[in-house]
Amino acid sequence: WLGDMNSYLAIQEGVLECCESALMAFSRMGARLEDSKLNFDPSRAWDAWLKLRHAIVSMEVLPFLNDPNKRELLKPEARWEAEEALKLSAIDLMQASAERSAFYQAWIQLFDQYDFLILPTAQCFPFDVQTPWPSSIGARRMNTYHRWMEVVIYATLSGCPSISVPAGWGGPDGLPMGIQIIGRPRADLDVLKAAQAYELVQAEWIHQKPPALRD
C-alpha cells in the first residue's frame, strides 16, 4: 500500500480512509498487507511524465494550433500542452526519458518484495459537473489541469498493468472512490485474477447504490 506516496500527493480528506477500509478485503483473501515507500522522488517522475505528455499530446494538437481557423476552437488545456511542447528541446526529452528509466528501476524493485502495489484511483472524490478540474485539494493548489490525477501516472510511466476496482464511498457526501491494483510488467492476467478475487470478497456491497442514490 503506497497511500499518498509518503505525504507527497495532495489527497482530499476521507480518500485514504475509504481506500484503507477496502484494503481489509485483501486480508480476507489471505494476503499480507504492508505500508510501503518508493525509493525515488515522486516529483522527478511527475516532471518526466509532464514533458513526455507535452510532446505526445502536441503531435495531435499542433495541426489545429497552427490553423488560424481552428486555433480558437481548442480548449485552453490542449493549447497549453502544445505550447509547452514547443519550449522543449531534444535534450529535455532525452532527460525526461532517462528519468523515466530511473523511475522504472526504482518501481520494479518494489516487486522484489510485493506481488501487487495498491494506490487510490483518484486524489479527490467526484466533483461538480460544472467544475472543469479541481484547482486545489485541501490547502494545496493544483498547478496544472491534471495534477489532481497524478496518482495514476506511476502505472503509466512503468508500463505496468493496472486495474481500478471500487473501494466504497466516503467524504461528507458519500461519494465513490476506487483503488488501483498494479502488477508486475506483463502480469496482466495476475492483475485480473486479483481484481476478480477482490470483487468476490466484496460481493456484499459492491453492487449497492451509493448513499446519495438510495431511497
Set out the residue ranges of the language-model regions.
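Short, Asp-centered acidic motifs that coordinate Mg2+ and/or phosphate
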Residues: D115-L117
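Short low-complexity, flexible loop/linker segments enriched in glycine and/or proline
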Residues: D47-R53, P134-S135, G178-I181
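Short connector loops at secondary-structure junctions
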Residues: A31-W49, W80-E83
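Short, surface-exposed loop/helix-turn segments at secondary-structure junctions
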Residues: D47, Q95, F127-M149
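Short helix-loop capping/hinge segments that flank enzyme active sites or metal/cofactor-binding pockets
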Residues: W1-G3, K51-I108, P120-F125, V129-Q130, ...
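Short, basic, helix/turn surface patches
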Residues: V57-E72, H146-E150, R186-E199
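Structural helix-boundary/capping segments
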Residues: W1-L2, Y8-L9, L16-R32, M94-A98, ...
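Conserved beta-strand edge residues that scaffold enzyme active sites
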Residues: N39-D41, C124-F125, W169, A212
